[in-house]
Every structure is written in structure tokens, then in C-alpha cells.
Amino acid sequence: MAHGEPYYSSKPDKDFNFGSTMARRQMTPTMVTKLPKFVRNSPQVYDWIVRGLIFPTTGKTYFQRVVVITGGFEDGTYGSFAFDGREWVEIYPIEHLNLMSSLKLIHKANALQERLRLSQEEKATLTLDVQFLQHENVRLKELISKPEPRKIQMKWIIVGAVLTFLSLIPGGYAQSQTNNTIFTDVIAACKYSTETLTENLDLRIKLALANITISDKLDAVRQILNFAFVPRSHWLRTVFYYIHYYEMWNIFMFVLAIGTVMRSTRPGTDLITLATSHLSGFRMAVLPTIPFHTTMTLWVMNTLMVCYYFDNLLAITMAILAPILGIIFLCFMEDSNYVSQIRGLIATAVLIAGGHACLTLTGTTTSLFVVILTCRFVRMATIFIGTRFEIRDANGKVVATVPTRIKNAAFDFFQRLKQSGVRVGVNEFVVIKPGALCVIDTPEGKGTGFFSGNDIVTAAHVVGNNTFVNVCYEGLMYEAKVRYMPEKDIAFITCPGDLHPTARLKLSKNPDYSCVTVMAYVNEDLVVSTAAAMVHGNTLSYAVRTQDGMSGAPVCDKYGRVLAVHQTNTGYTGGAVIIDPADFHPVKAPSQVELLKEEIERLKAQLNSAAENPSTVITQQPTATLEQKSVNDSDVVDLVRTAMEREMKILRDEINGILAPFLQKKKGKTKHGRGRVRRNLRKGVKLLTEEEYRELLEKGLDRETFLDLIDRIIGERSGYPDYDDEDYYDEDDDGWGMVGDDVEFDYTEVINFDQAKPTPAPRTTKPKPCPEPEAETQPLDLSQKKDKQLEHEQQVVKPTKPQKNDPQPYSQTYGKAPIWESYDFDWDEDDAKFILPAPPRLTKADEIVLGSKIVKLRTIIETAIKTQNYSALPEAVFELDKAAYEAGLEGFLQRVKSKNKAPKKLQRAPEDQGAQNYHSLDAWKSLLEPPRERRCVPANFPLLGHLPIDRPIFDDKKPRDDLLGLLPEPTWHAFEEYGPTTWGPQAFIKSFDKFFYAEPIDFFSEYPQLCAFADWATYREFRYLEDTRVIHITATEKNTDSTPAYPKMNYFDTEEKYLESYGWAPYIREFTRVFKGDKPEVLWYLFLKKEIIKEEKIRNSDIRQIVCADPIYTRIGACLEAHQNALMKQHTETSVGQCGWSPMEGGFKKTMQRLVNKGNKYFIEFDWTRYDGTIPPSLFRHIKEIRWNFINKDQREKYRHVHEWYVDNLLNRHVLLPSGEVTLQTRGNPSGQFSTTMDNNMINFWLQAFEFAYFNGPNKDLWKTYDTVVYGDDRLSTTPSVPENYEERVIDMYRDIFGMWVKPGKVICRESIVGLSFCGFTVNADLEPVPTSPEKLMASLLKPYKILPDLESLHGKLLCYQLLAAFMAEDHPFKVYVEHCLSRTAKQLRDSGLPARLTEEQLHRIWRGGPKKCDG
């Protein structure tokens, strides 16, 4: 092939075409056969080099040329080979930078392909294993023998026997016989009528004269108890006529026997006990002694009762001897069993002896029954004696809002900065040396360095804890060692011997800080910025647009001499640490001998001074050395806060002085027009919404939310003003006045509920070649409506900002630019048909601008439908929408999404179905079918029927997110005990256990005084709800992305779709229907929650259930309670309920400080189990009644029947399960109602007030010394004192009175608030929040229940975790792992808008609302 066609080993080799083409032409078949084993499908570099430069050669052969080939190997190395005429000989490798970069990418691609191949093989193997296991499972099931079911169940035989036994019980009474005739019956009837008429006349006269006495009232009650109101010929009279022949014990025994047969696990033992109780005559007295018995003592009692039936004296003797014999002969048992057996024998002796005495004296055992019950009650009541208590909870998920803050100096500073305008002036030319810069690459990220002397200087935080770093200079990578890091944020790296920079920087001998220059490499581009600097001690500050990767850059004067090292990265304000010649060399530390000598001399001086003046020694004892050795974390925090306070004060003073000329108020200008600056615009604005904060704890925030969060921080610092537009929304007008009681709506009128509200300043983006729509919304564009000063500002920035004047043709764009990810999905025939509208529906602009492209796309669509191959559609539609965007038209994919058509794969609403069967609240009743198989409803709940629904009851999905392959392997494995929930039918059944623990008593009757005190405390605490209003249903707000329940969920996946289709008419119609007196029964939909929980709970099928109601029903609840809920959120800082609480911007510390400032000695953290489900229904209804009493008096009476209907449907819920089963729930506070959290807060507080009165009595003065914060079932309290055995007593009280569950260990009482938890955060020494369960957060990252859409989402989630871990220990495994993951994902992002990581200053602004201060 010499002098023939060039040789290429593969297609990539031909594409790259590295090296000499002449060398490729010299390749012969022998040379090709003997080629080294380079990487398959990789490029090589061919060189044609003089032979004498490679092989030792003399004579004419010196100038002959040989072929040299350079390529890469499988192990990641590369080499060069020369052909000596016979074979390829390896020579010293020749460096080719382009080849090295290409080989690196090829190796990475090959590694990914190999990983994909292994994953596919593993998947195929696992699939085959699953099939084998399925076949084996079927085979084993066939081998299991199925027992023949009994033809007649044994329990029915037992029931028949019991019924026969009870029917033969003698129960007659001897009565006198009377002879009656028809005349005597007529006389008796007339007499009864006359007496009844006389009584009625007397009663009416007394009513007319209002002369009702107490005896009359007692007679009325007596008549009611005697059923005197029942007519003589009523069927109840007949029932009572036959029942009175039986004693009460017989009836009770009959009912108890039936219940025993149906539900008892030991029906034989229970029935024998009933029979022996009846035969012996002890009857009711036996029942209260049952809990004292064991199995053995129960049979002893049954035997003695049978013996008593035949010989009572023998039975009494044996009963008295039984405890004595038991004490002797059962002493071999362990203590717990021994005590239980003896207690049962003593109970037996008391029953036999006492029962015999009662039967002998009175003929019945009723008195013994009363005595035993009284003893049990006294024993139970003595457990709850206590003095004081306070309770606090810890593990809730909180929704965040920003607290209202008063106007202060810092706020005025930012507002003055907004009014100041931009700087003007002319900067001089500066000297820069790009050849003196390099890039420092570490596993944690990249930074900038510069050459000075024999060292490479950079920032210490760029180097981190690494001993060796990679230095990238002019495309080559060198490994260098970190030489020295002083106390400043500076690091000195030894320059490698083979690195020869073209320029070096020198230190400035006469520093001039008036104007500084910062130069650095950002994304391989050199960036330079000049600014005026301010000196603050050993640091500089200047206003530059700092970017990631600039840390460590040199800060030079105008002559190019180094002044400082750039270190701060907050996005706007830059900072640097001044570098001195003394920083280059470490200070020699004194030897150990010298240190010991100094220590001895210092101790001698202290001894001498102590003898002369002891007080002086005490005050002057600490020295510099000891101070450094005794510094703790709190001291460091205080020092940093002091430094930040001093820096901010200096910075504010300097800026105010510079901006003073611009702050003069012009004459004749009131500045109250539409363009005025709203100083209190951020007052009351949420940093995060409640839903977003809850997501933050579980799964992080999305990209847009994080960008808005960072924009708010930057906006505060950069000082862009917010402007009022023409439709400015007055925040003082809360809208309550528009919803009067008698407002009538015309349903035919189209009502526009949109309201213009102020929008934040737009985000500043990089300049683009063509004007973007963001340019039209920049704050400077609105400055034409300002005064002359702002017009001058606009002229200053004119060269750097796009102008609105003279737009070019088609320069405007519609919406956002199309993104390829939105088009890259599996297209089907429906997508292809609906992507383009019919030709008559195209606009004239579409035909003129996009006509040819639309015709081309129609051809592609027709071909795709015929061949059923839609792979070409995404790219074609994307190109069309891209052209439409550039022409200022709406994209066709966006048009399809904006048509509000019914969601895909959902049924359309049946046209023949009436409104009452589709929109009404009880539409489900007409679809209800008879009950069938019970699959997901437990046996102790009724099965009302089945509804046609297509929903899965199995979920075994554990997604595998490929993006997690970018993250490093974790070394901390505590997260493995958590995982995403999966379930089957058993999980639905077990989820109903949340409603059961213990049965509550009638505490309103048993403890009326304590309940009255709890009511007083609740009315006092929530008195700000007085005179709240019912609002109109169209003015309510709720989450419209929720499931609209059945049957609307068959046709719409969200309430938003339902509202778009039908508007407010169904809502108003159903509200009017209820208002007129109708009481429809609402259907709730139940589903299990997909979340991260412990694997043990998943194995036990312990998954939380969620119920949601019809959106119309929820909106009606919002009408009644939205005003109160809004007020509760506004009073978060002063009230106990933290429904509007936010841990951000100092909210957490302010809340904790509130409890600490109370001055009490103890702090209590309290936590319930199954709180929502075990709330007593009577208490829940009572709290709802308290809330309703706060409503305006007129509206309270007008809408009372609506409120009663609403609460009835909360407590008696008809629930639909995904299996189609319909059941009834009558317990707990449903999680899907409109005011779940607010109701839980009030119940939590009411229970605490009840506990206080229970332990301390209704002491109102003492109650005022307590303070508490609650959120749902979370509670954190402070109290002056705590009684002994507080934990045991309060646990027993909740179980026995309210039937609520508090586990041991969930009540924590300490003398310090540090270490206690509230809403998922643990309080540290600085009252800052630390995540209580970081292992759960790590599980949600590495074992998610939902795959993240893209890399930006993963990076945003990591930023959320960095935010949550802000106050964790620096060496905590979770925090270290998050930082490591951020360094990985930041390298893969390109122009995403998200920061590589949140800086320390940004974290402080988010958590504290500003820089770290000395006062916290």
C-alpha cells in the first residue's frame, strides 16, 4: 500500500485523521498485520520521522524516514512504535494532546458500554431466576394438600347448644291471679284515658302559667325512663312484655355467649365460665375478677363454683385453703408467674366466700359486684396522682413561612442600596499576566492558582485536606505537593520541576487598594474584572460578579502586582485575604523544651502573684497560650460572629458614605407614585411554602425553587428595587369583605378570579446574541417611568443591556425555548395525530413562516403511522418548535399541552350521565354494587359494597436511578435500614390498626371540672379567632393537584382538570344543596403513602394510609375554616400552634429562644404513636364545636346545619379502597381533610391543658408560667417543675382516659433544651437545627422511591441536603458524603443555573436571614 490510499484502522481513526497523511500512505500489509494491539475503534497518530532521530544510524540511512504510530492501550496507557523494517519497536512515547483527550473519552465510553453489558447480563440472569422461582412456586403450591372444609362449622353447633341451654332457664315469677271480663277491661280503659286526659290538662295549664316545679321535671324523667311516651299498641310494648319474664343476667349472659362464640379465641373456656357462673348463682360478681386470673386459677374457680352448686360448705373450705396451698406448692415458679397465680387464687377465695355471704344475706351477689368494681376503680385512680407536667414532641414535617419582622437598620440599608443606582467613573488600564495563572484540580472541585516565586499560591479551601493536587497549565496536568498552609485562607504548593510557567507574579511593595483586578480561569476561559476595594483588617472586599472556580485567583493592583488571594464566592460581593511576604514561610515553632521552660516560668509568676494578690491572679490568669488550648466550638462561633458584625458595620458605613449624594430627596417629589419602592414588600412573604418545606425534609426541592431561593438572597444584596405596576394588589385588602352573607351569584355570568399580584425582580442571565424575552422584563426597562435620575442610570448601563427600542423582525419570542428533554419520550399514534392541528385551524403566521416545515412534518407523520415507527418524530417536532420559537410563535407541543384536553389513558365523562349522578357528593351511591370478596378491609370493619374501579393493590416497585451511578460509594451504611415503601393487600388491612389501641372513657362525664379548665385554656389561647367569617366557596384556596376522589377520579386525575372543564358551578350547586338541608354522604378514597421508612416496617406491612375526600366537600370545609386557618398561621410567633412556622431565616432559633426565655427549669419533648387515629371521636367533635363558636354570631347560626353535616362526614367516613371495597370509618382525624394540622394543634393543646389540671388542679396562675409549641402531634414544652415518675404516670393517663398510645421512651425531660427535638430537627448548643435522622435523608438519596428526571434535579436535591446539614458536625458522615457528591455532580453540569454548592454565607442567609452575628 506504499504511496497508495491512506490507511485507517477504524472509522474513528478516519474521522479524527491525526498525524501525517504521507505516513499513512507508507503502510504495507506486513506493517498492518504486525500492528500493536491498540484500543479497538480508537484513533492513532501517524508520524513520518527521520530514522536518525529514532535509531542509532550512520551513513545514508540517517536521513531515511520511518513510520511512527502512537496509540492507546486497554489499560489506559499509550505508547509510540516505530517500524524498523521487520517489526514495530516501542520508542519513547510522543505526546499528542488531542490524542490523549480523545483516548480519555474513548476509555470512558468503553467503560460505560462494559458496565451496560454487565447490567444487561445481570438483568437477564435475574429475570431467568425470577421465572424459575415462579415455576417452583406454582409446583410447590400444587404439592400442598388442601384440607376438606367442614360441612357444618363447629361454632354454629355451639351457638345452638347455648341457645337451647338458655331457653330452658327457669325465669318465672309468682303473681296473683285476677279474673277479668270485657266490662272490667272497658272500665280500665276508660279510667286510663280519663287519667291521661287529666294529666295532659294539668301539664298544659302549668306550661301556660310557667309553673313547672322540680317534682314535675323528675316525673317527666321517670316517665321517659319507663317508656311512657311509647303508645300502648306499639310493638315495643310487646317486646317489653316478653322480656320482663327474663332477668337481666339471662339477657346479658345470652349476648355475652353469642359474642364469645363469634369472636373469642377460646370459646370453650369462656362458655364454661359463663355456665358455672350461672349454676353457682354468683353471676355478675364473677366478671370483674376475670382479669386477676391465669389459665390455671380460672379452672380452679370454675371447679369450685361447680362444687358450690352441690356442696357450698366444701367449696368455701377449699377456696379459703387454695391461696395457702398455692403459696406452698407453687413456690418453684418464677416471680412474675408466682405472683400472678397467687393473686388469682386470692381472687377466687374472695369470690366464693363473699358470694356465699351475699347470697345468704341478700339473695343476690349485686353488692359483691359493686364492691369489686369500686376496689378496681380506686386502684386504677391512685396511679395518676401527680403534681406538674409539660410535654413536647419532636418528629413532625413542617411547612415553612417567613416570620413578620419589624423594620430595622439592616432592612433600611438594603432599601437605601436599592435607591442608590449604579457607580459611575472611568477606570485606568491595568496590567494582567494570563501566563501566570493555572487551574488547581482536586476531588472536591476546581480553583485558580498563580505562580509566585517557586510556589503556586491558591486558597486553602480549594486544597482542602489534600496533600497532593493536580495543577493544569496550558492543557497539561501536573501533580504537585502542598507545601504549607498558614492560618489565613492561603495555600502554598511546590511548583513541579517539569513545569515552566511563562510568567510569574510579584508581591506589591507599596500596596494600593483603591482599585484591584481579579483574573481567573472559569470553564477554561480567562475572566478579568476590576473594582474598587475596601480594606477591613487582613481582608479586602469588592463588588464583582464572582463565579465558581475563581477561588484562589490573584487580586492585583493596576501594575499587575499581587495584593491578595480571592476567596469569597457569594455570587455578587467578592472577598480576598491580603497576602504578605511573611506568609510564604512558616513560623518556626518553639521546641518542646522551650515550651516547658516557658510554662514553668509562667507558673512561678502565678504562684508569686497569688501570694501577693489572689484576686488579681483570678482575673488575669488566662494567657494567650491557655486561651488557644481551651477554645471550644461556642468560642469559635462567637469569634466568627463578632468578626462578621464588625465587617458588616464597616461595609454599611462606607457604602452609606459613598451613596450619600444619591440619597437626597428632590424637591416637589413625593415619590408615592406607581414606581415607588415598597419597603415592606417582603413582610410576610414565605421563604418556602408549607408543602415545599415538607418535601425539603423528605426529597429536596426542584431546580426552579432553588433558583428563586438564591435569587432572593442575591436580590437583597444587589439592591434591585421592586416596582409597583398598574394593577398592584393591595395586601391590606384580604378579601373577606367581598364574601358577604347574602351575596347572590349569577351562574350564567363568567367570573374572572385572576388577581394581579407583585412579582419578584427577574433573574439576570448572560447576554445572548439575539434579544431574549427576559430583556423585556428587566428592572432597567421600567426606569423610563422614573425620574431623571433613573433615566441617567439607564444611559450609563446602555452598552451592556439590550434595549426595547426598534425591535428587529421576529425578535420577540413566545414562552420558553424548547428543550430536547421535553420531546424525548416514547411517541405513539395518538401523539402523532394530535401534534399538528388541521389545516383550517392554522394561523396565517403559521402558513407564511412555517409552511414548508409543517408540510414536511405531515409527511413524516403519515409515514410513521403507516410503518408504526415513530423514532423520527421527536427530532422533527423539536426542529419545528425551534423554528417557531425563533419566529416568535407558540410551539406545537406547547399548544397541545395547553388545550386542557382530558388526560391520557383516562376515561371521558359519560355524556348520558346526569349532573346529579356525576357531580353530586353522593353520586357514588348509584354505582354501589353488593359486597363480594373481602380483600383489603379488615374483619372488624363493615363491608358495605363494591364500586367499579381500576386501581392496583400491589406495589413492589423499587426504582433504580441510573443517575446515582455518578455518586461515590458511601462508607456510612446506617441508611440501609430504610427504604421505599412497597405493599400488598395485607398492608391495607394492617393500616386500619392505627385506629385502635385502648378504649377511651367518657371523660366529659368523669372529669367535668378538668374538661372545663381545658376549654377555658383553649378559648384563651385561640381568642384571636373571635368573630371569624365563613367565606364564599369561590374564594377558597387549596391544592388543585390532589386526587378528586371517586367517581371524578375516573375522568380527571386532578381537581385542576375538573375545574377547567366545569368551573365553579358544581361547587356552588352542591353547597346550596347542603345549605337547603340535604345531607349527602361523602365518599373518601384511601391509598397508601409512598415514602421512605424503616425496612422493618415494610416487612411488617406497616404502611401509612391517606384518605382524600371529594374536592367539593373539601372546598365546603375551606368555606367554614379557611379564615381561621389563615389567622392561625399569622399568629405563629405568639401562639402555641406552629402551622405557619418556618425554621428558615432565624425562625427555628427564635422559637427555641422563646421557650428558653420563659426561665423555667425543665424542657419536655413528647411524642405519640398513632396520634391521628386514636383521637377520641367525642374530643374531635368537641374541638370542632369550639372552633365553630369563634365564628361570627350571625353566620354561626345561619350555617350551623352545614357545619354539623361537615363534621358528621368527618367522623363517619365512607371509604373506598383501591380494591373497590367500600367500608365505614368512625375513628380518628382524617389526613385528607382541610384543617388536619390545625385541628391536631388544638387537640394537642387541649390535651395538655387537661393534663395540667389533672396533675395540678385548675390553677390558672400556674398555667400562665408554662409555654409550649406544637405542630400536629409534635410538642416541645417548658415547665418550672416535673413530678416524680412523670413518664409512667402520663403514659397510663393517656391510655386509660383517652385510649391514646404513648410509648415508653417517647417522653424526654431535661434541664436543657439542647438535644431535644422538634419537627425533625434536634436543637444544638447554639439553638440551631440539626436533622434528627440523617440516615433517613441519605436513604431518600440512595434508595429513592421515585427516579429523578435529570442531573439538575439530583444536584438540586444534594443542595437541599447541604442546606439541611449546615449545622451538623463537619466530620459527620452524612455531611461529608453530601459534599463529596456535590463535587461529582458539579463537574457534570453545564450552564444549569444551579451553584456548585451553597457557600457558608448563603447558608447563613437562608437559616439566619443574614450574615452570622455576635448575637446569633
From Swiss-Prot:
The reaction(s) annotated as catalysed by this protein in its Swiss-Prot or TrEMBL entry are:
RNA(n) + a ribonucleoside 5'-triphosphate = RNA(n+1) + diphosphate
Bias (Basic and acidic residues): 783-795
Q: Where is the composition biased (Polar residues)?
A: 805-814
Keyword set, alphabetical order = ATP-binding, Coiled coil, Covalent protein-RNA linkage, Host membrane, Hydrolase, Membrane, Nucleotide-binding, Nucleotidyltransferase, Phosphoprotein, Protease, RNA-directed RNA polymerase, Serine protease, Transferase, Transmembrane, Transmembrane helix, Viral RNA replication
Q: Which domain of life is it from?
A: Viruses
Residue(s) at site: Cleavage:
Q175, S176, Q419, S420, Q664, K665, Q755, A756, Q913, G914
Q: Which residues are listed as membrane-spanning?
A: 154-174, 239-259, 286-306, 313-333, 344-364
O-(5'-phospho-RNA)-tyrosine modified-residue sites: Y693
According to the UniProt entry, the coiled-coil residues are 104-146, 587-614
Question: What does the entry's PTM section describe?
Answer: Cleaved by the viral and host proteases. The protease is probably autocatalytically cleaved.
Question: InterPro entries under this entry?
Answer: Astro_1A, Astro_p19, Astro_VPg, DNA/RNA_pol_sf, Mamastrovirus_p20, Peptidase_S1_PA, Peptidase_S1_PA_chymotrypsin, Rev_trsase/Diguanyl_cyclase
Q: Where in this chain does the record put each RdRp catalytic domain?
A: 1161-1287
Active-site feature positions = H461, D489, S551
Q: Which Pfam families match?
A: Astro_1A, Astro_p19, Astro_VPg, Astrovir_pp_1, RdRP_1, Trypsin_2
Task: Tell me which GO cellular component terms the UniProt record holds.
Answer: host cell membrane; membrane
Which intervals of the chain are annotated as region Disordered? 752-815
Q: Could you tell me the EC number(s) of this protein?
A: 3.4.21.-, 2.7.7.48
Q: Which GO MF terms are attached to this record?
A: ATP binding; RNA binding; RNA-directed RNA polymerase activity; serine-type endopeptidase activity; serine-type exopeptidase activity
Q: Name one GO biological process term.
A: viral RNA genome replication
State the family it belongs to.
Belongs to the astroviridae polyprotein 1AB family.
Protein name (record):
Non-structural polyprotein 1AB
Gene source species: Human astrovirus-5 (HAstV-5)
